[in-house]
């Protein structure tokens, strides 16, 4: 029995709508294929074995046992020949039984592999947002990501379904079914809905833990379901907001289930986790005071950029060129929010054929947001750590921000020279903002190793128009 008096808790009618395998479903629909009956995956850089699987249809996941994110070399078949890959199978401990090989090759030939089209996904997301707005005001809608979001239907239920003999729970289900229908008719995408006549948390838990398994892809969790459904969640990490690190800390306290968390002392949880511990306790008891009408705005902890290179970079000069370009790209974002960084970090991932896997570096610096200075710091960090080898992925990250009007001068600094450089940087940013990033480029950006021009054409780090990896 919960210690919470739910009669005192606020109630709202919430639908949390999630597009089923969104990118893959959009690709299926655009080709006239059934999203649930087609084996399809969206793969960036499908022209090489390091191609990144961004999304896949439910059938693809079922057949090949893969989640959304993975690499082409994780598949049991060669993406070019569609033949069974004994090398990949051996590396992953898969069967090489002839029947299994035939099964994989049959499905490999039937599988559609397509490049990402980020502009199309954004276009479909906008269409879905317009559908949401037919059932609630803009203030009632809180996008959670490109393929999911909350709708507060509290004010809409009686408007769309005025029959007073129907319960609010049934009205919420009926209206959610209409939203599902409209999304499918407009976009060809199936959607799953977690519902709650209580709060957003329970709607999200209903989606993650039940709705995805029901025949109509809907489920409702409200206050009267807390002790049976919320406490019945089998794994701590299946609960919203609990990752592997938090799970380990909870287990050290002797907490292995959501029910145990809900009945633990909130004071002891606060002692271990601070205010977050109290929030965990309330959430485990189904209480959530977040408001869809006031979207959560996370405090910025840093800005970064990461990319997987199109090939192995072996020459140090080429690696440093990409590092410099990325240092500049993140510096531009830093200036756009009028901040300076005091901490620079890099992460370098080696080719999978190298013995070493990766290394990281970090340094504290005087506050700056100037491209030239940040490039020097990034390159300096790299040179301290790099001992040769083929590099395949690079990340640059700035953190520990201060306001841009803070400047630290030494006796050897020339204030006029600093001001001159800042004015030049401001002018360059303004030109690029109006006419595009590639308007002003250094000569080395035209070399084959450069990534700045290619990446300026991407949306969300991936191809906007679907030509990625195609000749």
Give the residues covered by each predicted segment.
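Long, highly charged, low-complexity intrinsically disordered interaction regions
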Residues: 175-237
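Acidic, metal-coordinating catalytic segment for phosphate/diphosphate chemistry
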Residues: 26, 360-471
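Core structural elements
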Residues: 146-149, 340-354, 397-404
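Residues that scaffold, gate, or flank divalent-cation-dependent active/transport sites
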Residues: 1-150, 155-157, 284
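Short Gly/Ser/Thr- and Asp/Glu-enriched loop/turn motifs at secondary-structure junctions
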Residues: 108, 143-148, 195-199, 339-343, ...
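Catalytic palm subdomain of template-directed nucleic-acid polymerases
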Residues: 150-180, 254
